[in-house]
């Protein structure tokens, strides 16, 4: 058995690491979700929670769940405080599209597209909080 000597490799810095959470197959149009995530990108965790709770859009709830999950991942996996987190990146990608048919007159059927999306949230420690 060969053992590698990793003594001169420094451990990764916790302040530079990003933690992510992904919500897949959210039954909502990516265009509608992008309207909301543009408002929270770059904000602190607590400020993003306040914004998401009081915005009148249906897309806020799955985004709120994903942001809370990313903060819980950062707290559990890296031991970062939720109060010092900022949302570094938020992305929305198109997911699979469910295709259905609506019955119409004279035996016709018109297609219906039911889009879904994937929401990815990255959080990291606030840079000004690192100098302790």
From Swiss-Prot:
Give the primary localization class.
Answer: plastid
Q: Where in the cell is it found?
A: Plastid, Chloroplast
Q: Which CDD domains match?
A: Ribosomal_L22 (cd00336)
Report a single Gene Ontology molecular function: rRNA binding
Cellular component annotations (GO), alphabetically ordered = chloroplast; large ribosomal subunit
Swiss-Prot/TrEMBL keywords: Chloroplast, Plastid, Ribonucleoprotein, Ribosomal protein, RNA-binding, rRNA-binding
What biological processes does GO assign it? translation
Its domain of life reads Eukaryota
Q: Which Pfam families match?
A: Ribosomal_L22 (PF00237)
Q: Give the matching HAMAP family.
A: Ribosomal_uL22_B
Q: Which family does it belong to?
A: Belongs to the universal ribosomal protein uL22 family.
How does this chain assemble? Part of the 50S ribosomal subunit.
- What does it do? This protein binds specifically to 23S rRNA. The globular domain of the protein is located near the polypeptide exit tunnel on the outside of the subunit, while an extended beta-hairpin is found that lines the wall of the exit tunnel in the center of the 70S ribosome.
- Record protein name field: Large ribosomal subunit protein uL22c
Report the source organism.
Staurastrum punctulatum (Green alga)
- Upper classification of the organism: Eukaryota, Viridiplantae, Streptophyta, Zygnematophyceae, Zygnematophycidae
């Amino acid at each position: 058995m060969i053992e590698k000597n990793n003594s001169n490799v420094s451990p990764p810095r916790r302040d530079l690491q990003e933690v992510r959470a992904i919500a897949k197959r959210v039954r909502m149009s990516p265009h509608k979700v992008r309207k909301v995530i543009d408002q929270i990108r770059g904000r602190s965790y607590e400020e993003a929670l306040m914004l998401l709770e009081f915005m009148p859009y249906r897309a806020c709830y799955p985004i709120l769940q994903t942001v809370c999950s990313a903060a819980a991942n950062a707290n559990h996996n890296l031991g970062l405080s939720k109060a010092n987190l900022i949302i570094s990146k938020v992305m929305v990608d198109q997911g699979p599209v469910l295709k259905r048919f609506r019955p119409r007159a004279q035996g016709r059927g018109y297609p219906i597209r039911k889009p879904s999306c994937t929401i990815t949230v990255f959080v990291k420690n606030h840079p000004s909080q690192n100098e302790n």
